[in-house]
A protein has these predicted regions:
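Phosphate-sensing "switch" segment of ASCE/P-loop ATPases
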Residues: 4-5, 76, 85-86, 92-105, ...
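Conserved ASCE/P-loop NTPase catalytic core
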Residues: 1-103, 107-115
Length: 254
């Protein structure tokens, strides 16, 4: 009995099993604090999909402090090449290795006009609006057009296959490089593409300087961020070509 009691006093309690990590690619309704919790386990980043971006923009002004913190968190994630430390009483501390998430959603044209005017009239714009790289602004159509078609099952199947490949393929097998063993892989422009990019970037720079001379500071900021937009679109199109089977691996895989 003495030996048994001694064993019970010194034996360690079994460790609780580690909670499995859920792969997340999309989020909808989440605070910036919860987005941070999700990002710490999402090395590939996530996409915040908003049915109405107007609600997101309005939330920044609902409570001064909370809105300011959320706006700052959104702004900081734009580059997509950094990390982020969170230290909060009650929430503890954690580390986000890949501090990146994109915003995508719909907004009424009238709200776009309002947001643009606010950015233009603000003397200390923080560049939030300019970080929305693409806007689709519909033309007003008075005529009625009925659209009632069955979905194309072949296209839907191909879309699923391409999406799965994008989530699972190894970019290094298709020519992507790494600076360090733990760094994210990257692609380089071909010589022809690099020449075309430099010509475009030179013209972009001229337009940016013209906007600065005319004191069109919001427009200037938007033009300056087009460098990232073109690189991002090039990468997206290239990876879609890979996922569609139009680009083969750089070497044979056994």
């Amino acid at each position: 009995n003495t030996k048994k009691a001694k064993f019970n006093d010194t034996a360690e309690e079994p460790k609780a099993p580690r909670k499995p990590k859920r792969k997340r690619f999309l989020i909808n309704d989440a605070t910036h604090e919860m987005i941070g919790e999700i990002l710490k386990d999402a090395d590939q980043g996530v996409i915040a999909l908003h049915d109405e971006l107007g609600g997101l923009l309005a939330s920044f002004g609902s409570q001064a402090r909370a809105g300011s913190e959320a706006r700052s968190f959104y702004l900081g994630s734009w580059n997509g090449d950094g990390s982020y430390h969170v230290d909060r009483i009650g929430r503890g501390s954690f580390f986000i290795k890949n501090y990146w998430f994109a915003r995508f959603g719909g907004i009424k044209p009238s709200l776009i006009d309002k947001v643009v005017q606010q950015a233009i009239n603000c003397d200390h714009s923080d560049g939030f609006l300019e970080r929305f790289q693409l806007f689709s602004y519909p033309e007003f159509c008075e005529e009625y057009h009925e659209c009632n078609k069955f979905e194309d099952k072949d296209i839907k199947k191909k879309y699923g296959e391409v999406s799965h490949t994008l989530l699972t393929f190894d970019p290094t097998l298709f020519g992507a490089k790494k600076d360090f063993n733990d760094s994210r892989p990257f692609f380089r422009y071909s010589k022809e593409a690099q020449i075309a990019y430099r010509e475009w970037d030179r013209a972009r720079h001229v337009r940016q300087m013209e906007a600065r001379r005319n004191k069109q500071y919001v427009f200037e900021s938007s033009i300056s961020k087009q460098k990232v937009l073109i690189g991002s679109l090039s990468l997206i199109f290239h990876e879609f070509e890979i996922a569609s089977g139009n680009i083969t691996p750089s070497f044979n895989i056994d």
